[in-house]
Amino acid sequence: MWVMMRLRRTGQEVYFQCYDSKEAAEMAVKVLNSVASGWEFYIR
């Protein structure tokens, strides 16, 4: 599963990292969204 990141200011999307499991991807998204202010992380 790909975790994507979107720059909030411009809406630009970037492939961030690929995870083997949905659980790992969800955990990463939760952690990343709590620490990154200018980026929004989500699962594609």
Annotate each language-model stretch with its function:
Residues 19-42:
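A short, charged, amphipathic alpha-helix used as a generic interaction element across diverse proteins
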Residues 1-15, 42-44:
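Short aromatic-glycine-(Arg/Gly/Cys) micro-motifs in beta-strand/loop hairpins
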